[in-house]
């Protein structure tokens, strides 16, 4: 299990740009670590998203790709529906970045790839793109904007399965409005040759149900690829396919109604295979409330789904379900007994141990005057059997403003941990009299060791 005493920060303060807030995607390629960073806005050259490379031996970072700039137009000013007061303000005449983030990243060898290549999905108001690199130095665009629909803001997980690459769109921009978490195309896409930009729809929209408004996560388990939806009316659903024949494939539903919690389990935020079962982390955005759909407040749950369709409640709210009485096997209520853990954002398997990382909004309690001093920070919990969980950290490794974990990547050098840092909250806390170093802004990346390695590493997809 991870030993917090071995934690080493290998990147901080946004790694050269404190406006780089989210360590959004990550992969090991040709022995080096690649990191895609995201900015909450794209107001000028200072918000151009970057892909960085870390050399484990030298211990240094290199910027290998920076988003190009483009002239600002109406899409640059799109009103963000999640934020009061409208959309983004362009502050530079030099232009705005085409990409303000890189959301998905994986190593994959398609039909025309001579060797495995690094594929990256972008966040762009002009339609998310897929980038490809064969050497980790040059990145080329290998897709149409939005895979043919430039209203699609980005793509979440890039998941290899049975020689094909799968992804799902997230975010939409239409009629001057930006929706970061929804989509106008809740569909799984597939390609056996992404280098040629050839993509097909692998599913019906919403799997045939319009209430499945978004497909958040994909993960393989055995002979099936599983997909987790967001369904604000009835609760998340889990679907699976063997991906046989020509797309769109045949899919079957294996879990619905938010595993019996209905809309309080509106969305699947993370999935990973561990010891022959699929582990599912749920969540609601922000402070655990979706005001647009009048859902919440609620904290995240952790659920274990078996290949036969039966499920176990591990962390969550006791209840009766179609499977009978469900009592959390970890003996912990939603959010690992912490109501501020609104989302399970990342999971991975490293050295035979399951790691679960959260989004924690506790810092807002201070900003709302509910606590005397800033407190909070993401949680990481660990389990060797999927039922008995031990905390690795419950305070963001001492940083209350590190609200969440966006990357968990097992490597031979340790577990890579990348954060989502709300630097603007540091400014607000300082204005309210807190003893806060406002210069400590921007994402951070750390390596943490397990002194007793064993088992095969697996990571959940990004998004």
Listing of model-derived features with the role each one plays in the protein:
Residues 1-21, 28, 32, 40-103, ...:
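Trp- and S/T/G-rich repeat-edge/linker motifs of beta-rich repeat architectures
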Residues 110-111:
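Calcium-coordinating acidic loop motifs
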